């Protein structure tokens, strides 16, 4: 192991802009996912993160078709997914995990159909596994805005969210709106999914959203 090897392996790569962008997005995505993961595990919403990560695929495709930033389409698709889960769950009487499975697989299938019908530069592999080295300056700014925003919201409301996670009945009894806290947590989850999509894609988001909280819980 020589000094030249060390420089070429660990130092020279930072001279490339795409490496710096990829590293920055990875750090931001991993940090906000780990922060949110604790509440997701406590509330029992681990599958919700998986559902949203798959459900954003049609939003990404539609955003490209109409010329919007991918993050806008992904965020809207995530909110639509949450709304559909609530509507189907309340209207059918099915358990929440069953409804999640139905909704997110349907939206993922819709996204794959849209990719096939509207050929574009969107590669399915990049949607599923991310495109870390292809992150643009615009993508970086989207992550820089959304990741701290989600983190700040969770930190500011951490006491209310923790009480909601441990004892929603007590939270409601002392005047907290459990519906609003639930909606707030879902919005933060949607923003976090959009951030992580840039780095790891739809498949691996669930690992960033579950493993940190599960590790802390143990």
Please provide the spans of the model-predicted regions.
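Transmembrane alpha-helical segments in multi-pass inner-membrane proteins
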Residues: 203-218
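Generic alpha-helical transmembrane segments of integral inner-membrane proteins
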Residues: 27, 31-35, 76-84, 110, ...
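Short loop segments and helix-boundary regions at transmembrane helix junctions
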Residues: 38-120, 217-218
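Mid-bilayer segments of alpha-helical transmembrane spans in multi-pass integral membrane proteins
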Residues: 83, 87, 105-120, 135-144, ...
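Hydrophobic alpha-helical transmembrane segments
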Residues: 23-28, 71-76, 101-102, 140-145, ...
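Membrane-interfacial amphipathic/re-entrant helices at transmembrane-helix boundaries
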Residues: 1-31
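Membrane-interface helix termini and inter-helical loops of multi-pass transporters
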Residues: 4-16, 121-135
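Membrane-helix/interface signature in polytopic inner-membrane proteins
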Residues: 152-185
């Amino acid at each position: 192991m020589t000094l030249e090897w060390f420089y070429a392996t660990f130092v020279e790569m930072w001279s490339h802009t795409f490496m710096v962008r990829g590293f920055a997005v990875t750090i931001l995505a991993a940090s906000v996912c780990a922060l949110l993961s604790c509440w997701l595990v406590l509330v029992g919403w681990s599958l919700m993160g998986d559902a949203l990560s798959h459900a954003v695929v049609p939003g990404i495709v539609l955003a490209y078709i109409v010329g919007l930033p991918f993050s806008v389409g992904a965020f809207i698709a995530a909110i639509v997914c949450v709304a559909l889960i609530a509507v189907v769950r309340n209207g059918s009487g099915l358990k929440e995990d069953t409804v999640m499975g139905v909704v997110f697989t349907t939206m993922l299938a819709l996204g794959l159909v849209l990719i096939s019908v509207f050929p574009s530069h969107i590669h399915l592999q990049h949607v599923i596994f991310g495109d870390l080295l292809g992150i643009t300056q615009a993508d970086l700014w989207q992550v820089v805005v959304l990741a701290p925003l989600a983190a700040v919201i969770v930190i500011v409301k951490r006491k209310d969210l923790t009480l909601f996670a441990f004892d929603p009945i007590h939270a409601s009894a002392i005047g907290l709106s459990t519906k609003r806290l639930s909606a707030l947590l879902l919005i933060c989850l949607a923003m976090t999914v959009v951030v992580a999509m840039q780095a790891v894609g739809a498949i691996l988001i669930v690992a960033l959203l579950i493993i940190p909280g599960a590790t802390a819980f143990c």
